[in-house]
From Swiss-Prot:
It holds the Pfam family CbiD. It comes from the Bacteria. Signal peptide: none annotated. GO terms for molecular function: cobalt-precorrin-5B C1-methyltransferase activity. GO terms for biological process: anaerobic cobalamin biosynthetic process; methylation. It catalyses: Co-precorrin-5B + S-adenosyl-L-methionine = Co-precorrin-6A + S-adenosyl-L-homocysteine. The keyword S-adenosyl-L-methionine applies. Its EC number is 2.1.1.195. It comes from Clostridium perfringens (strain SM101 / Type A). Pathway: Cofactor biosynthesis; adenosylcobalamin biosynthesis; cob(II)yrinate a,c-diamide from sirohydrochlorin (anaerobic route): step 6/10. InterPro entries: CbiD, CbiD_sf. Belongs to the CbiD family. Keywords: Cobalamin biosynthesis, Methyltransferase, S-adenosyl-L-methionine, Transferase. This is Cobalt-precorrin-5B C(1)-methyltransferase. The gene is cbiD.
Length: 365
């Protein structure tokens, strides 16, 4: 077991290692065994983080001209669909040089805009370099080797990853920029958002941001079919910056009033631990509109923005328009006027109802 820990939220959490580290270790081990004609049980690799890993080799398979073996992915205490997967590498002797291929269960890139060219196996640049470096460190100078990375359960597990959204088919991606998995990593989630924005920007001049699956469902149930939706979680500001970096000038944000109201107060990370001003935004607008303090207090006494909307009923379209206009103003300020923004605000979960749509929105035209 990988014995490296970090502190997060007062808890001690165990780190893990990436699919890229697993692939590099398996490739190095298979190459070593192929040319040295002997089995080994542990292999050491370096990582871009300058942390050495000693990983246990599994499932050694010897054939006439090749050897394959696996490393089990250990995600530590991170919630990771690939944790526990066997990542295999097959080493075959060739006349000269080094070749890297993707086999069964390693995804194939089908769209432009990712870090790997269209049609190539989804082995990201850093893992590619790691694999090459580790293999060449044990490859005899007068020999050549072809490495094939494969993941027997890759197709199955890929359905639980971002790959289907990114146009990566038939398997998982071999990932990792540091070689180490840090539990509950905010950076890992933000990087996945950055990648999706980059990929969706290739064939689209505009993007639609949603906070989660409910926002996407809201659009699909109303017949929206374009492939320009990006799930941004709570990272509104970060996602805007990524879109601007890709030259995107038209952005629509679709969200529940509980999320969008936070932007009206200038909160660009909408996680409840960072900002929770949903009821305060509604209460302030009611006060500014001249409603009595008894109603304002009833709103503040609600547990959720959903409860506040249901309490108020159907007679407050001007309230949602005022909140929506403040959201648009905040977005414009954040982007320094460099993008055109629209918003769609809804409430509900099973049956979602539109509360406000900005005047220039044309998603359903």
């Amino acid at each position: 077991m990988f014995d490296m820990y970090i502190e997060s939220g007062g808890k001690k959490l165990r780190c893990g290692y990436t699919t890229g580290s697993c692939a590099a270790a398996a490739a190095k081990a298979a190459t070593y065994m192929l040319f040295n004609k002997k089995d080994i049980s542990v292999i050491e690799i370096d990582t871009p983080k300058n942390i050495k890993l000693n990983l246990e080799i599994q499932d050694i398979q010897v054939e006439k001209n090749s050897i394959s073996c696996s490393i089990v992915k250990d995600g530590g205490d991170d919630i990771d669909a690939t944790s526990g997967l066997e990542i295999f590498a097959k080493a075959e002797e060739i006349e000269e040089g080094f070749e890297l291929c993707g086999g069964e269960g390693v995804g194939v890139v089908t769209k432009e805009g990712l870090f790997v060219e269209k049609g190539q196996p989804a082995i990201n640049p850093v893992p590619r370099e790691m694999i090459k470096k580790e293999v060449l460190s044990v490859l005899p100078k007068d020999k050549g080797v072809r490495i094939t990375i494969f993941v027997p359960r890759g197709r199955e597990i890929a359905k639980k990853t971002f790959n289907p959204r990114l146009g990566i088919v038939n398997g998982i991606s071999i990932l990792g920029t540091t070689g180490i998995v840090y539990p509950m990593s905010e950076e890992a989630l933000k990087e996945s958002i950055r990648i999706e924005i980059r990929q969706k920007s290739v064939n689209n001049k505009d993007l639609v941001f949603v906070f989660g699956n409910m926002g996407e469902r809201f659009l699909r149930e109303r017949g929206y079919k374009k492939d320009n939706i990006v799930v941004i979680s709570n990272y509104v500001g970060f996602s805007i910056e990524c879109a601007l970096a890709q030259g995107i000038k038209d952005l629509t944000i679709v969200g529940h009033i509980g999320k969008l109201s936070k932007i009206a107060f200038g909160c660009f990370n909408t996680h409840s631990r960072v900002s929770d001003v949903r009821l305060e935004v509604i209460a302030l607008e009611l006060t500014l509109m001249g409603y009595d303090l008894e109603l304002v207090q009833k709103v503040l006494d609600q547990k959720t923005s959903e409860g506040a909307v249901r309490l108020l009923g159907d007679d407050f379209p001007m309230l949602y328009e005022r909140i929506g206009e403040k959201v648009l103003k905040r977005l414009d300020i954040y982007a320094y006027g460099e993008a055109n923004f629209n918003i769609l605000m809804y409430y509900g979960s099973k049956e979602m109802k539109l509360l406000y749509e900005s005047k220039n929105s044309n998603l359903f035209d």
